[in-house]
Curated annotation (Swiss-Prot):
InterPro entries xref list: Ribosome_maturation_RimP (IPR003728), RimP_N (IPR028989), RimP_N_sf (IPR035956)
Role description: Required for maturation of 30S ribosomal subunits.
UniProt family annotation: Belongs to the RimP family.
Top-level taxon in the UniProt lineage: Bacteria
Gene3D superfamilies: RimP-like superfamily, N-terminal
Annotated spans, Disordered: 48-88, 212-258
Cellular compartment(s): Cytoplasm
Gene Ontology cellular component terms for the protein in this record: cytosol
Organism the protein comes from: Desulfovibrio desulfuricans (strain ATCC 27774 / DSM 6949 / MB)
Cytoplasm as UniProt keyword: yes
Identification of the protein by name: Ribosome maturation factor RimP
Alphabetical keyword list: Cytoplasm, Ribosome biogenesis
GO biological process per UniProt: ribosomal small subunit assembly; translation
Biased composition (Basic residues): 215-224
């Protein structure tokens, strides 16, 4: 079974239980390293909103929504409704994993040994379509390409790159645009002062949102803190014995000269 066929099978088998739990399938990733690894990512339903779309506009017909919840009599009584979940829970991922593993066993979809992983996309999420990138305009994205791509702007310096990192500034029908940046190991983001680069989606091998974690600064000495021991006021300090010894030595020298 090809990777594309395997991903389609995983989506078909997982969709019923995922939908029942009020979640959506974010994407499926497969890898073959000795044995097949299948990663299913599930998330809470969101409505992508293109930049410039006014708030409160009608939901597009292609958007995926969760099943309508049953009417709660407490809503009419003025009770405060619980906050909407922001991510799938561990228990939900475990339940999806059990159902999906059983379905794969019944259909014998994967002949060889395999590893099944069900999780949320996380903060550094992998994008499986351009539509998924729309809510993350303004975030830093890393794009790994099949072949090196150079900026088409004549003002750009540097050659083609296989890996681009930049702030996501626009999402088009068949491409997305990054403003190149550099990210230091300490989590500092600096603009490369280059024109934005347009990356066709078909040229992208892997695109992920970069979660920038700034390392905390190490605690240092307070500014203006004196070095060594503080000399007490009034001239009585560690230097006083040295002065007294110097005077005594000078007295002995004068007596010897006499």
């Amino acid at each position: 079974m090809t990777d594309n066929a395997l991903r389609e099978t995983i989506i078909r088998l997982a969709q019923p239980v995922v939908h029942t739990l009020g979640l959506v399938i974010w994407g499926v990733e497969t890898a073959r390293a000795g044995r097949t690894i299948v990663r299913l990512f599930v998330d809470v339903p969101t409505i992508p909103q293109r930049p410039g779309m006014p708030e409160g506009s009608e939901e597009p017909s292609s958007a995926i929504t969760a099943p309508a919840p049953a009417h709660d009599p407490q809503e009419s009584s003025g009770a405060e409704a619980p906050a909407a979940p922001t991510s799938a829970t561990i228990e939900q991922c475990e339940e999806i994993s059990r159902h999906l593993a059983l379905a794969l066993e019944v259909e014998d979809s994967i002949a060889d040994a395999y590893v099944l992983e069900v999780s949320t996309p996380g903060l550094s999420r992998l994008f499986f379509s351009l539509e998924q990138m729309i809510p993350y305009v303004g975030d830093v994205v890393e794009a790994r390409l099949h072949t090196p791509v150079a900026s088409t702007d004549p003002a750009a310096h540097g050659g083609p790159r296989r890996v681009w990192r930049g702030t996501l500034v626009a999402v088009e029908d068949d491409a997305f645009v990054l403003a190149p940046v550099t990210v230091s190991p300490e989590g500092e983001v600096e603009d490369e002062n280059q024109p934005p680069v347009r990356l066709p989606w078909e040229a992208v091998r892997r695109a992920t949102r970069m979660y920038i974690f700034k390392k905390p600064q190490k605690p240092g000495k307070k500014p203006g803190k004196p070095q060594g021991k503080e000399v007490p006021k009034g001239g009585s300090g560690s230097t006083a014995p040295k002065k007294a010894a110097a005077k005594k030595k000078a007295g002995r020298t004068a007596a010897e000269n006499d």
